[in-house]
Regions:
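A short acidic, Gly/Pro-enriched loop at the edge of an enzyme's catalytic core
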Residues: 105-114
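Conserved SAM-binding loop
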Residues: 82
Length: 123
């Protein structure tokens, strides 16, 4: 990816807000409606691709303290803003990573729920 394109993510930040339709409670309910047996929301591992500053992910982490949340975003600026909020809120169950999703490392592990709302909204 070009440096110019990378810089644009910091120049024009995505407005990061909660999107309740992506909460694991909602996703699990939809899974039940389709005959699935979704993983427990209370202890789930949740990944948000394109998390920006964590505006969607942090409220989830606050409401589900025994779950684990990982957010990835291309913008180091937004990820750092989100990390500041994580520290201010004292959330121990959130990890925000600045990275290109095409370079997603296997060591981040498997996830029970994956959200990519911001990616589709921004594109």
């Amino acid at each position: 990816m070009s440096n110019e394109l990378l810089a644009s993510y910091d120049t024009f930040p995505y407005q990061s807000h909660p999107f309740r339709q992506s909460h694991p409670d909602r996703l699990a309910t939809i899974g039940h409606l389709f005959g699935m047996t979704p993983p427990s929301v209370e202890t789930a591992r949740v990944l948000e691709i394109g998390c920006a500053a964590g505006g969607n992910l942090l409220p989830m982490a606050e409401s589900l303290p025994n779950a684990e949340f990982v957010g990835v975003d291309l913008s180091p600026r937004q990820v750092e803003e989100g990390r500041d909020d994580v520290r201010k809120l004292g959330l121990a169950n959130v990890r925000l990573v600045a990275m290109d999703i095409t370079d997603f490392p296997a060591d981040l592990g498997a996830f029970d729920y994956i959200v990519a709302h911001g990616v589709y909204s921004w594109v």
